[in-house]
Amino acid sequence: MDDNKRPLYLPFAGPAILEAPLINKGSAFTEEERIFFNLEGLLPHVIETIEEQASRAYDQYKNFGNDLDRHIYLRNIQDTNETLYYRLLQNHITEMMPIIYTPTVGLACERFSKNYRRNRGLFISYPNKDRIDDILNNSTRQKVKIIVVTDGERILGLGDQGIGGMGIPIGKLSLYTSCGGISPAYTLPITLDVGTDNPHLLEDPMYMGWRNQRIGGEEYAEFVEAFMEAVHRRWPDALIQFEDFAQKNAMPLLERYKDRYCCFNDDIQGTAAVTVGSLLAACQAADSKLSQQRIAFLGAGSAGCGIAEAIIAQMVSEGISDEQARQQVFMVDRWGLLQDNMPNLLPFQQNLAQQVAKVEGWNTESENISLLDVMHNGKPTVLIGVSGAPGLFSEEIIKAMHTHCERPIIFPLSNPTSRVEATPKDILHWTKGQALVATGSPFEPVVIEEQTYEIAQCNNSYIFPGIGLGVLASGAKRVSNEMLMASSRALAECSPLAKDGEGSLLPALEDIHSVSKHIAFAVGKVAIEQGHALPASDELLMQAIEDNFWTAEYRRYKRTSF
């Protein structure tokens, strides 16, 4: 128990205190607290420490036979005793992150309605569009500072999961707390229930969402506008993270709101920031610059294009022109290499399309320039997969890349594991252990000829908790591109590979607290420099980060009257 902090004064007692996850201590209530809060007889006699509770919980956790059951068990602890939940994650973060988030959370989303047990967060349904203010006021969390919101249309690589997508905001906010030290009392997951186009859900008698085809067009835009305005009225200083919106909505929503509210899209900007940070670390280890690389993408959706734009911005900051940087980036989708004469390019793709004149002399084997054609002609040194389609990084493609690049950098980032473009084991075997590999989902280390290769997980959890902490500590009113670039550079500075040629590309998850604080400082400093936050010295900013960093310790309680 943290005796250095002042006690919390609570106006209620008895079973009510045991049913409030944010304040429940279970068997850790002291004898004095049990008397004052009318808890005598409601708990077993023994008074435990949080570590004793966590030890029992971990023993129970290990007895479950599959990851989904482990996920459900951990969620039950979260809905019963949040402090214990986060102590358990703190003690076993590497083991449990794949359980509370990707890849297991994908299965939890698919089975959300079937496994539903208890409310968490807010569901705002389109039929209730005129009562959004009332719905927000129904939240028991009064000081919300970070919101993760989804409409469930593009959940990981699984597509439309309707309200089942709520598993993503819940899981994401668990990482804000366990990795970034954001108090769970300041977090709120929200799902915008605008219907679903998933026929399996519409026909499922257990589906708990609004049974209707998804709304779109002006109806959708007006609903999201009403939501954003209502959130700003209720919690004007809250950071809003857009999560798993479909491509057709993700970028337009970000463009519409990024200069009006404190918000960002993790799929576009968070993924870009962690990818750029990982690339910077890889380049530092090779004593080169990102601006010297030639980069091929498989997948030209909003996430892939967001990463590409962030890479180009970093290249330009290193001294090359925007035009030159764009010539070094090759975007490939199902129709082949994006070229500026293609019809129906989306707005965010147009500036990333290669000029036809630059590639018309290429020796190609297909009418549309394929990824393999790009390997032979463009000779990329970096390959990034955000296609959501498994197995597309074939042996032929990887070996073609390796013929012109001794140490290729290969990031198959698609989630969940079942959607990855190639496994690290295959990539390392095909390149004889020479590739630098990072993935979007967790993979076991690979052993080749008695050498073990740790596989870095290029996971947004390295970035967004630090961004959230930096925004909260500095009081930033916006999330700018420069703040995101600062987060990438800060992550690269934490890379073990930069200090040791045999080290991992990304830090160990056990070091995530120090990484998040380092990123938070970089983000907050840029926010202050840009005028998005009030002036503060480096010392004051660092102190604010420490003051806002929540740890999973019980507080002392005192009783007060209503």
From Swiss-Prot:
Sites where the protein binds NAD(+): R154, D267, N415
Enzyme superclass (EC): oxidoreductase
SUPFAM superfamilies given in the database record: Aminoacid dehydrogenase-like, N-terminal domain, NAD(P)-binding Rossmann-fold domains
InterPro entries attached to this UniProt entry: Aminoacid_DH-like_N_sf, Malic_enzyme_CS, Malic_N_dom, Malic_N_dom_sf, Malic_NAD-bd, Malic_OxRdtase, NAD(P)-bd_dom_sf, NAD_malic_enz_proteobac
Cofactor note: Divalent metal cations. Prefers magnesium or manganese.
Cofactor field: Mg(2+); Mn(2+)
Keyword vocabulary terms for this entry: Metal-binding, NAD, Oxidoreductase
Gene Ontology molecular function: any one: metal ion binding
Subunit structure: Homotetramer.
Family: Belongs to the malic enzymes family.
Protein name stated in the entry: NAD-dependent malic enzyme
